[in-house]
């Protein structure tokens, strides 16, 4: 098998980029993203919040007396791997504190990973200050979604340990100091104008309105994140991306004590007091990119994007993709964000149930997408995720990273160690084809992010309560 893989790998490395034409599920027109229809309105709401509330920067958050995690040159959480194992080419790990490592009742589950190496080519953020050198405090970020449907009835109404009215807390992002291990959570929020005409905000959900629908619009899954320039691109499974500008981070803790509500059961402005489910920092959405079926995140009930994440299928005739994960590629001549679809374990008889990966170009500066003549963010490559009959489990991909045309895919496998899959595009079939045996990873691996260097590093995070670990491997 290895000799066959080597021969195939050599042929793929010399193949000229092209797009397969015989697979309708890979037609690039399926994957264009449009700017959300209410961008100007959203920005106006954010401006009102910024006028009312104090802002704070990334480094100021890292300087604060926050939570304390642990860096290790070994596996910092033995429960994150099967007994006696370690991810292949392992380099370093980070463990959250005991509360965030979680237990059987954990409400927050980690998903997406990005770092300052995505954000800026020099891999630092901000300018030196007295007693603070940004080169010694390089930030990393991890998204977490609020698990609000424990019984699987597609109704995000299951109260957590904080009591009533705590469902649908949405998404938080951990800002992590890659040197000290200090970290803090920032709650992502969606701004709106309340009935009194004041700027307020709610949690980030699959749709940003209340409804009696069976779906009830649960917390956004946020399975991927890319930090590029000042912007965070957070995966919206059924649309594309929610976009957050880091210049808009708000520090509720800097308000007078009577204005900051620390209750974990409330969010938004209520009677002149600002709540955020107990969190100090919030970051409001200011922009977004959406597929052609959904032009806003405030749609009337019943539109194509009024569904929970797992309602989109993974079939041969799929058109509109899921955006389950995301990663930045700085190695290509034009920078790209690579997204892809999580699909459950593929059936052994169906090579089309593994999902797809899609690449969209980014501008070299400004942190913005590279748009076509119509103002759309169009894809220029798309491929089927590997289907390899040498293995009984295909699909289950939770993250993708690309370095010099080689794709690295993180595959979760329940409570067994996951795998890192290495593949190259076969442009004749439109499918990624594996070029080496699958590599041992950890339990519950998620999104991937590249930290360029000598050597390069691939970062991922494991999601299961009690088994959580942020770690890197060399590709």
Model-derived regions: residue spans:
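Secretory targeting and sorting signals
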Residues: 1-20
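Beta-strand-rich domains and repeat architectures in extracellular enzymes and scaffolds
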Residues: 32-162
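Surface-exposed loop and turn segments in beta-propeller and other repeat-based domains
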Residues: 50-106, 181-216, 256-319, 367-393, ...
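Structural signature of eukaryotic scaffold interfaces centered on beta-propeller domains
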Residues: 105-137, 217-228, 312-336, 393-404, ...
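Loop/turn-rich, solvent-exposed surfaces of beta-rich toroidal or solenoidal domains
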Residues: 138-140, 327-441
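Short loop/turn segments immediately following the C-termini of beta-strands
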Residues: 143-147, 237-238, 246, 340-344, ...
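Beta-propeller blade signature
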Residues: 161-179, 244-269, 349-370, 418-430, ...
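Blade-level signature of beta-propeller repeat domains, shared across WD40, Kelch, NHL, RCC1
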Residues: 445-475
């Amino acid at each position: 098998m290895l000799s066959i893989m080597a021969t195939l790998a050599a042929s793929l490395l010399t193949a000229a980029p092209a797009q397969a034409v015989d697979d309708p599920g890979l037609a690039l027109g399926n994957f264009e993203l449009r700017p959300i229809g209410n961008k100007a309105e959203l920005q106006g709401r954010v401006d009102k919040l910024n006028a009312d509330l104090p802002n704070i920067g990334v480094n100021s958050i890292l300087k604060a007396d926050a939570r304390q995690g642990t860096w290790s040159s070994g596996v910092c959480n033995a429960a994150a791997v099967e007994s006696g194992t370690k991810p292949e080419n392992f380099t370093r790990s980070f463990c959250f504190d005991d509360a965030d490592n979680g237990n059987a009742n954990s409400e927050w589950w980690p998903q997406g990973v990005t770092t300052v190496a995505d954000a800026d080519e020099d891999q630092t953020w901000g300018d030196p200050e007295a007693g603070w050198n940004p080169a010694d405090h390089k930030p990393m970020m991890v998204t977490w979604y609020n698990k609000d449907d424990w019984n699987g009835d597609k109704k995000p109404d299951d109260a957590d340990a904080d009591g009533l009215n705590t469902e649908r807390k949405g998404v938080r992002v951990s800002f992590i100091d890659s040197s000290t291990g200090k970290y803090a959570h920032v709650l992502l929020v969606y701004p709106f104008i309340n009935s009194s005409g004041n700027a307020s905000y709610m949690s980030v959900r699959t749709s940003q309105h209340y409804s009696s629908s069976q779906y009830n619009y649960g917390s956004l899954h946020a399975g991927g994140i890319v930090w590029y320039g000042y912007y965070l691109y957070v995966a919206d499974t059924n649309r594309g991306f929610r976009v957050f500008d880091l210049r808009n981070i708000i520090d509720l803790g800097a308000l007078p004590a009577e204005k900051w509500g620390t209750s974990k059961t409330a969010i938004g402005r209520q009677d002149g007091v600002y709540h955020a489910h107990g969190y100090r920092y919030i970051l409001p959405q200011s922009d977004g990119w959406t597929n052609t079926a959904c032009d806003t995140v405030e749609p009337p009930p019943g539109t194509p994007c009024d569904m929970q994440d797992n309602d989109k299928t993974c079939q041969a005739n799929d058109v509109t993709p899921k955006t389950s994960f995301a990663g930045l590629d700085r190695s290509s001549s034009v920078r790209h964000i690579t997204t892809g679809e999580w699909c459950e374990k593929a059936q052994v008889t169906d090579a089309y149930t593994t999902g797809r990966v899609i690449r969209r170009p980014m501008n070299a500066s400004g942190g913005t997408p590279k748009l076509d003549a119509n103002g759309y963010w169009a894809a220029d490559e798309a491929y089927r995720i590997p289907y390899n009959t040498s293995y009984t489990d295909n699909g289950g991909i939770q993250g993708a990273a690309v370095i010099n045309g080689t794709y690295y895919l993180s595959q979760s496998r329940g409570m067994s160690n996951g795998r890192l899959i290495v593949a190259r595009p076969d442009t004749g079939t439109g499918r990624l084809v594996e070029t080496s045996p699958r590599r041992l990873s950890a339990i519950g691996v998620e999104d991937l992010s590249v930290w360029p260097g000598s050597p390069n590093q691939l970062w991922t995070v494991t999601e299961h309560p009690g088994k959580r670990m942020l770690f890197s491997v060399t590709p």
